[in-house]
């Protein structure tokens, strides 16, 4: 599909008019103009107990959009743990089919249809699961191939299920991304990381008052400063091995200069202005599972076409992406 037509594809599958109206009017604004992210609707965990999702090879399809940091981290973990052969993937177009509707489309696939699920839009899967669903259809969305229904869109915990419940399918010598002796500390760290940085950039970008925007931006850069200091003392956030925390930090950092800096006005500093953070981000990017799942083109398109007024769909030329492949030296440093 040509780039110019990405925002104007026709909706080949007619959705319930009331649902479309809800999507158009969906608001995640709180008191004082603050952005309040909608809760996840499908949060059933994986496990052996009654009512929990069964761990089963080739039963689930992971729907993602390369632009979304929450979905990206699930794809990174899937790759690092070697789950590619047991969990299939469906990929959504980086540009929404209708700027006024918070939906995602399978327009990268032949005939604009996911080849396995046979749907045009992510919202079709959400409505098939819950006909009364009125929120935004979001990614990652894990779909049960037996029922063609969304069984989990809990981005905050999905990676941890892959790390702890899918171990029998992990590849030989898979990294321990969520070491049991550090889980409590990692969870506490990740909670604050999400509030101040991961979701913090969205709090800034979708703020509706100056005060809400200012508060969000200040918190974003306080957290970046904290990470900069922490990374002076270790190669990764929790020592010399990649953990769940690094993946969660990476998906925001890799989008920072190319998207958030301009689109969400988090522009006090660039990632490149931080010595440790910039080398750390390059270190992760140059690791298999990170660079091969990072789509800069998709990220740039989504945030500059769908998230800000841009009627002519003009994309910035920069930043220079070749710098992501420059030497980082974090593997050669001595840390104290």
Question: Where are the predicted features?
Answer:
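C-terminal alpha-helical interaction module
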Residues: 1-336
